[in-house]
Curated annotation (Swiss-Prot):
The species this protein was found in: Caenorhabditis elegans
The protein's name in its UniProt record: MAP kinase-activated protein kinase mak-2
Active site: 135 (proton acceptor)
Keywords: ATP-binding, Kinase, Magnesium, Metal-binding, Nucleotide-binding, Nucleus, Phosphoprotein, Serine/threonine-protein kinase, Synapse, Transferase
Lineage: Eukaryota, Metazoa, Ecdysozoa, Nematoda, Chromadorea
Main location: other
Post-translational modification: May be phosphorylated at Thr-173 and Thr-285 by pmk-3.
Consequence of changing residue 26 to R: Probable loss of kinase activity. PML axon regeneration after injury is partially impaired. Partially rescues PLM and ALM axon termination defects in a rpm-1 mutant background
């Protein structure tokens, strides 16, 4: 994988504006010195896992529904090697936040179908290259701009993995977000690209009603009851939210949420399903989604925090999966996020800023 080895600050001005926090690193805004264009900069410690993330993201880059990678740098700060990934700046925000911000404007089934079509387009692109994303969730689906017709794009390849002959053992490392993970991910079975289809089914379910099909009744990232529901495929289409949803939509959800991976619909079959292939003809029926997401805004934020904690602190054993609570997690990144601000300690971004500051001062002196 090719990358620049000279300082990123030669090409970009680095801002302290945090755009997001991924499982493997922080994302801040940066500005290209020559063009003045704004980009997103992700900082990763240079590890084999980070290189895999960057390599797969670069491979997938260029598709209309995948966040583009523009530059990659390898720099060292205080003796720590880092990869700095310059990406497209997604100014439109996260998928469900966009729906929450609609206010009284109705969100329709036709709009939901259009969104799922965009997500499926990105996943189909990955699967054609034998890449499983393995972390499909609303926070990783971002809009390019705030315009109503802005494109939705997939990002964060921190758990992505090749599924072809280069991975002879299959995907047997359990990387997942509880609310969106497939049953086979919860056990010791191997799993593959079909886990992405399960995640699409969960996202589609939430888009059509405003709440997830599987949840923890005790507010924990993964309760035994929630785990049992996922493994047995227990979910319903309750009234009144689902009374107005088309049978075609419910049919696709049933095919996506099948517990047996070999029986689950593929991404190609999903794209051919009439609810997706004819998404412009889907009924323009108003849904309860927007009001439910707003009514549960506080719970939704807590759920996102739980998912992030789980992603960063999961521990996989041969017989079971143990997930630390956020309070027990020793992950510094999550602790900073929970406290509402980043501590400057051990943050490569601060070293980058100091280096840039020194460069600017040298220019002023000379």
């Amino acid at each position: 994988m090719a990358f620049h080895e000279y300082p990123v600050t030669q090409d970009y001005r680095i801002s302290r504006k945090v755009l997001g926090v991924g499982i493997n690193g922080k994302v801040v805004e940066c500005e290209h010195r020559q063009s003045g264009d704004k980009f997103a900069l992700k900082v990763l410690r240079d590890t084999q896992k980070a290189r895999r993330e960057v390599e797969l993201h670069v491979m997938a880059s260029g598709h209309g529904h995948v966040v583009s990678v523009h530059d990659v740098y390898k720099n060292s700060y205080n003796g720590v090697d880092c990869l700095l990934v310059v990406m497209e700046n997604m100014k439109g925000g996260e998928l469900f936040n966009r729906i929450q911000e609609r206010g009284q404007k109705a969100f329709t089934e036709r709009e939901a179908a259009g969104i799922v079509n965009e997500i499926c387009s990105a996943v189909a692109h990955l699967h054609r290259m034998s890449i499983a994303h393995r972390d499909l969730k609303p926070e990783n689906l971002l809009y390019v701009t705030t315009a109503s017709n802005a494109a939705l794009k997939l990002t964060d390849f921190g758990f992505a993995k090749k599924t072809d002959e280069s991975e002879p053992q299959g995907l047997k490392t359990a990387c997942f977000t509880p609310y969106y993970c497939a049953p086979e991910v919860l056990g010791t079975e191997k799993y593959d690209k079909s886990c992405d289809l399960w995640s699409i089914g969960v996202i589609m379910y939430i888009l059509l009603c405003g709440y997830p099909p599987f949840y923890s009744q005790h507010g924990q990232p993964m309760s035994p009851g929630m785990k049992a529901k996922i493994k047995s495929g227990q979910y319903t289409f309750p009234s009144p939210e689902w009374d107005c949803v088309s049978e075609a939509a419910k049919d696709l959800i049933r095919k996506l949420l099948r517990t047996e991976p070999t029986e689950r619909i593929t991404i190609e079959q999903t794209m051919e399903h009439k609810w997706i292939s004819h998404y412009r003809r889907v009924p323009d029926t108003p849904l309860f989604t927007s009001s439910n997401l707003n009514d549960q805004r506080e719970q939704w934020t807590d759920m996102q925090d739980e998912m992030e904690a789980t992603l960063a602190s999961m521990r996989v054993g041969p017989e079971n999966i143990q997930i630390k609570s956020l309070g027990d997690s020793n992950n510094k990144l999550l602790a900073k996020r929970r406290k509402g601000g980043a501590s400057p300690k051990d943050d490569p971004m601060d070293d980058i800023k100091e280096e840039e500051k020194d460069d600017e001062e040298e220019k002023m002196i000379s």
